[in-house]
């Protein structure tokens, strides 16, 4: 019997031929290269109004196929004006979302291979490369060996630190339920974090069914670090009232100022009260690749889980979070659901890792590929040089601020985030921020420190240099000179 071609069965949907794909692929790379070359000519912060992009596009999908060249033309003329240019050297506002050339190219391979790595069986290379690369990172960053795959612990790539803390909360919840007497409700389980902790901790408690009111936000000191004595008192109070402390999130590098909680002291308290300790080092963690910044790891050996984001500062494009646990069996037990159609026959022959049991979704992308490309393309020494360069530039910027009479530092931890303000009230500083961002040449954000409106400048872009930061400083001073006191 003659075999039918797919086009005989479903018709030809208009696939590109291999040659068309090759030609269009070259065009796409050329477009990106041109974009990077001219990126400084665009306003860093998009100038479009809400709804402008949507109203510029057809309200209904095209009935017939369109040429790739037409799609690229619309990308240039309609989409690009609505882009805030995260890869621009003048983007200083938020923590960066690095997109280095090796990581971009790795994403092309990942998309082309089209891997769905939920099980070892569905792509052995996807699983085993992830295990290897995460072990590499333990070594690169001087993390505790308990996080290596060869022991009871291990690592997994999540999409973000938000997913990592959710997994940690669920694992802690389930572990506590197996130890505690049945209560019939989860309302007695109490968690703790600093008031400077990321908002994802509160969201995790809501999603996990624990309730936001069950998360105690502990006040911070003048440096933004959790006040240990207040945490100790709150735990004692909750125990006295018949509640069960079960989870503490420590922050190493807060979103607002890069402040760090006293992890070692918190870890001892967590152990004393049988609490799961999760350490969130989403931004600052990458700095530990440099031995001189390993103080950031102090106390992590006491953690049950730890995470950081290579997509922020390790030259790896979004999304990529490295999430480590001390005991992988606890995490798997909390998240595993095994219907018959997901049984892995290879697991009967010898143990294999099925990363679907380490995360919330079933499906998963081949994220390890871009980490592998980045680490091999730059080497550990290259990544260290990159990080040290950013810290050196941030140090210089902080010194410029300190030397200027009308300006003052409001927070600087010695890494790559500088918080500062000009003399005057909050309204004057807010006006300065708006004036700076309206220039289009740079983009800053703000935070409130001890009630004072402060501007944030984060040095972390792939294409940033001392010269671009010096130019930014000149823009800031020029704008400040026009703001009345």
Question: Where is each model-derived feature located?
Answer:
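Conserved PLP cofactor-binding pocket of PLP-dependent enzymes
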Residues: 412, 417, 439-456
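Conserved PLP-binding catalytic core of the aspartate aminotransferase-like
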Residues: 408-436
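PLP-dependent enzyme catalytic core of the Aspartate aminotransferase-like
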Residues: 449-485
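Short loop-beta-helix segment that forms the pyridoxal 5′-phosphate
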Residues: 137-167, 216-219
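N-terminal entrance/gating region of PLP-dependent enzymes' catalytic architecture
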Residues: 2-152, 442, 453, 462, ...
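Conserved PLP-enzyme active-site core in the AAT-like
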Residues: 163-332
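Active-site C-terminal subdomain of aminotransferase-like
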Residues: 298-402
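Short beta-strand-to-loop capping motifs
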Residues: 325, 420-424, 459-461
């Amino acid at each position: 019997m003659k075999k039918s071609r797919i086009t005989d069965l479903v018709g030809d949907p208009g696939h590109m031929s291999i040659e068309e794909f090759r030609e269009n692929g070259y065009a796409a790379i050329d477009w990106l290269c041109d974009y990077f070359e001219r990126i400084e000519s665009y306003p860093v912060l998009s100038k479009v109004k809400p709804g402008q992009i949507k109203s510029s596009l057809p309200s209904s999908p095209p009935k017939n196929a369109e040429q790739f060249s037409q799609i690229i033309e619309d990308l240039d003329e309609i989409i690009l004006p609505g882009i805030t240019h995260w890869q621009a050297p003048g983007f200083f506002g938020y923590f960066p979302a690095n997109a280095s050339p090796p990581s971009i190219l790795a994403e092309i391979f990942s998309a082309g291979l089209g891997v769905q790595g939920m099980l070892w069986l569905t792509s052995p290379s996807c699983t085993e490369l992830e295990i290897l690369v995460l072990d590499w990172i333990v070594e690169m960053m001087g993390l505790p060996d308990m996080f290596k795959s060869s022991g009871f612990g291990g690592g997994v790539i999540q999409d973000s630190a938000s997913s990592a803390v959710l997994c940690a909360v669920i694992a802690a919840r389930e572990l506590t339920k197996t130890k505690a007497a049945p209560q019939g409700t989860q309302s007695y389980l109490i968690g703790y974090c600093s008031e400077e902790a990321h908002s994802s901790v509160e969201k995790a408690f809501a999603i996990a069914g624990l309730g936001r009111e069950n998360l105690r936000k502990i006040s911070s000191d003048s440096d933004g670090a959790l006040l240990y004595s207040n945490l100790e008192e709150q735990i004692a109070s909750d125990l006295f009232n018949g509640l069960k402390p079960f989870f503490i999130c420590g922050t190493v590098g807060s979103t607002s100022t890069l402040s760090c909680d006293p992890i070692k002291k918190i870890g001892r308290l967590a152990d004393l009260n049988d609490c799961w300790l999760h350490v969130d080092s989403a931004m600052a963690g990458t700095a530990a690749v440099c031995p001189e910044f390993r103080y950031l790891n102090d106390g992590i050996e006491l953690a049950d889980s730890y995470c950081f984001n290579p997509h922020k500062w390790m030259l790896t494009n979004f999304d990529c979070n490295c999430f480590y646990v001390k005991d992988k069996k606890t995490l798997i037990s909390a998240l595993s659901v095994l219907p018959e159609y997901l049984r892995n026959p290879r697991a009967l022959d010898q143990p294999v890792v099925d990363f679907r049991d380490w995360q919330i979704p079933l499906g998963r992308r081949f994220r390890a590929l871009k980490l592998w490309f980045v680490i091999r393309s730059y080497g550990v020494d290259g990544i260290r040089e990159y990080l040290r360069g950013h810290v050196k530039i941030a140090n210089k910027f902080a010194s410029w601020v300190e030397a200027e009479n009308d300006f003052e530092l409001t927070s600087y931890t010695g890494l790559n985030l500088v918080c500062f303000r000009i003399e005057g009230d909050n309204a004057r500083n807010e006006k300065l921020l708006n004036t700076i961002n309206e220039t289009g040449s740079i983009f800053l954000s703000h935070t409130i420190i001890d009630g004072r409106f402060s501007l944030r400048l984060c040095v972390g872009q792939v294409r940033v240099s001392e010269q671009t930061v010096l130019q930014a400083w000149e823009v800031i001073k020029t704008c400040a000179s026009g703001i009345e006191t």
